[in-house]
Amino acid sequence: MPLVQIQHLGGAFTREQQTELIRDITDAFVRVSGEGIRNNVLVTMTEIQSGLWATGGVPLTIEEVERRRAARQAAQG
C-alpha cells in the first residue's frame, strides 16, 4: 500500500489546497494502478513550524515563502 508523506512549512498551503493535493496524489496512483488501489493510498501532511525548516543552514519562514510566491507570480505576468 502506497504511503506518501508530505512535509511543508505551516501556513504555506490552505486547508483547501492541502485537500486538493491529497486528492490529486491519490488520483495519480489510481491512474497508474487502477481504481482498486484508491482505498489503499495513504497520504499524510505534516506542517513544520515557520523558521524550523532550513535550506543551506538558513531558516525558512512563511514570510520568505510568501515573498518568493509573489515574485514568481509577478514574473509569470
PLM region descriptions:
Residues 2-77:
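A domain-level signal for the structural core that forms small-molecule/cofactor-binding pockets
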